[in-house]
Structures are given as C-alpha cells and as structure tokens.
Amino acid sequence: MWCMRRLPTNSVMTVARKRKQTTIEDFFGTKKSTNEAPNKKGKSGATFMTITNGAAIKTETKAVAKEANTDKYPANSNAKDVYSKNLSSNLRTLLSLELETIDDSWFPHLMDEFKKPYFVKLKQFVTKEQADHTVFPPAKDIYSWTRLTPFNKVKVVIIGQDPYHNFNQAHGLAFSVKPPTPAPPSLKNIYKELKQEYPDFVEDNKVGDLTHWASQGVLLLNTSLTVRAHNANSHSKHGWETFTKRVVQLLIQDREADGKSLVFLLWGNNAIKLVESLLGSTSVGSGSKYPNIMVMKSVHPSPLSASRGFFGTNHFKMINDWLYNTRGEKMIDWSVVPGTSLREVQEANARLESESKDP
C-alpha cells in the first residue's frame, strides 16, 4: 500500500512556452497570482548517447526554442497552497485530484499545465467518464508514478501507452500490475530478456508489480494515464498525450541544466517518436565521451514484435554499466520477486557506497 508523502517544494520550476497561451482564468475570470516569476530562456543543443539494438551512436539534439523558469519557491512555502489560493472554486474542484495526489516534487514543474485549456477539457472528459463508467486506474493511483518516483530521483524513463483495462491491473505504472495479478504477456517477455542478461534474475510470472523499479528512479510512464474499463485506448487523443509529453520535456530540460543522468528506454515506435520529437532524430556521430542523457531503442516487448528485435538487446545491463562505469552512480536492481536481488548489482552498489565513505 502506498503512502502519500509531502516533500519539500523548493524544487526548480521549469516552464516551456513559445508564446503566451490562454489559460483557464480567461474562462473563469480568476485573478492571476502577482507572485508569478518571469521566464528565463534556456539553451538546447546538448549531445546524448543513443543505443539502437546494441550499437552506440552520438547524437546532437535539435535546437528547440524553450523557456526555463529557474526561480524557486520561497523557503518554507507550499506550492500547492499558493497555487490553490489563486484558483476559482470551480477550477479548484476540477483539479482536486492533482492538488491532493501529485507528489510535491513534481507539482511545481507541472502546475502551469493544469490551467491550460487542453488540460481543463481533459479533466472534464475524465470526470464525466468516471461518473458514467468504470475507469482505470482508480483515481488515487492515476498519479502514483509521481509519488513512487520523485522528480529529482528519476534516472530511467520507460514509456508505455495506455493503462491495462481490466480489474485489479492498472495502478499508475506502465507495464506494471497490482498484486496478485500475474504478469501480462509483454511483461513476461521483459522477464525473459532480464533472465538472459542476469542469470540470477528470478523469473516468476505470478509477479507483475514493478514498484521496486519505480522506487529506484525508474519512471514507468504511460502516454495516456486513464482508460475506460475493457476498452483499450478509449482515453487516447483527449489530452493525456500532450500532458505526458510535457512531463518528458520537463525532465529533459532539467537534466540538461543540472547534468544529472537520464536514460530513455524506448520500446516501440510510439515511445521512440515521442522522445525524438523532443531530442531530435538520431544521427551517426563519433567520439568517446558521452554526456548525461542516454537513449536506448528497440521494438515493443509485445508477443507480436518481441522476436523482431527486443530479445538480445542487453539494454538492462547496458544501462547499469553506463550508470556505474561512466556516471559513477548506483545500478538499478531489476529484480521483481520480493526477497530477491541481482548479485552483480548489489555488489557494485556496495562498492560504490564503500568508496563514497572513504576519506
């Protein structure tokens, strides 16, 4: 069972706008906060490392016009409280789920999206769907990814499509299912690949909960965050894709600014196109020194495509080798069965901790 925590809210706030957009205050007539900080233009053009079926290539990001607000909230202030006070009662009610369940580390980065017309329409649609139909995941779990993987802890991003649409499956994490639901077909193939890469990985298809990954900094993000029961893709093209693309963009902008590691593990064309629309298409380059963003691509682990390039990629191990050997950071323990672990990962992480304690 998850526990919602309130984290400090002095996170860096990043906002990207090419032009002034109409916000919901224009609809409801609410006053804009006088505390709004001016935007500061950010830079793009960083390089990153791309792995496609095991081949490393250096890639230049395309220059993307964007603005980054690097001002922080004043110490001891609460972003949600400040934000909520400047909303109309109607909008406050509509955004109650965002205010109550999005982790404090994410909220300052995302809050500008909530006032945009597309998001208001999206919330109106989802609210009506929840009133008229069964919608997955349960409301409290729609943003569980923010609580399980705080913004500044994200190291790896895995992008899915829409949530599982049967009972006791979706809980806000892509590819993951609630216990005791067994692993779906795509996740079974993920386990098969992990077993090839790490022989001591315990492959148990009765287990489908990937919360252990999320708690280590693996963001499991679906591009659509809700779905009507037994109706796949029923909530796609209603605004979630715009929102989750912004989530990815904010992570890229933040990591470009602070140099922290970020890995994209992209399975299938939808995930690849989303990230390439922000980072640019890959192009062959040269050089032995790679900066802080790595992109790894393959076909989707679905039974329909896994045999055409998912198996044998060695991506999970390559991610760990890059984090540990190149970035000097802890590896991800990809184990899923409670009480099990990957020996190689545990030993490497123990060495790293020991080295950090040495004078």
UniProtKB/Swiss-Prot annotation:
Which factors induce or repress this protein, as stated in its UniProt record?
Answer: Induced in late G1 and early S phase of the cell cycle.
Compartment annotation: Mitochondrion; Nucleus
- List the Gene3D superfamilies hit by this protein, alphabetically: Uracil-DNA glycosylase-like domain
Q: What is its EC number?
A: 3.2.2.27
Note the PROSITE patterns from the entry: U_DNA_GLYCOSYLASE (PS00130)
State the similarity comment.
Belongs to the uracil-DNA glycosylase (UDG) superfamily. UNG family.
| Miscellaneous comment in the UniProt entry for this protein | Present with 4820 molecules/cell in log phase SD medium.
Give the function comment from the record.
Excises uracil residues from the DNA which can arise as a result of misincorporation of dUMP residues by DNA polymerase or due to deamination of cytosine. Not involved in strand-directed mismatch repair.
Question: What is the name of this protein?
Answer: Uracil-DNA glycosylase
